[in-house]
Amino acid sequence: MIKTGELHTQSLRDGRQVYLDGGVVDDVTTHPAFRNVVASVAQLYDFQSQPGNRELMTFAVSDGHGGTGGPEMDARANRIWQLPHSYEDLVTRRRALVAWTELHGGFLGRAPDHVASCISGMYMGRDVIEAHDPDRANALADYYRY
């Protein structure tokens, strides 16, 4: 199964401690300061999980983890984690990014593609990092595969 908005929202109810204005936020999914952005991100995951968007928004991964929570996630990951190996891969990944951006109109400052694109880009150049610090390169690879 591909990650849905509900799975994403549930994942935020994991006991994390969030503070706002000196107070503890009991549930970021319902708190007035966060609930709208939680709903906006959930909408992105709902879009990717629609059967008609499966190929546009996700790609098959070989390690069975999908980058989104384990084998139960159907061994697919969002294209934001895809490492392009050809011009066609790059164009396909861009189409997925455009589709998500059109959903939020560019007004979601830190959409899930933000960090994933940074991590994926660094992962593609990990040989440069490895030349300076093999342990950091291995940590990056572990993070990407997670």
Language model features with spans:
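Glycine-rich flavin
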Residues: F59-Y146
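Acidic/polar, glycine-rich intrinsically disordered N-terminal extensions of enzymes
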Residues: M1-G67
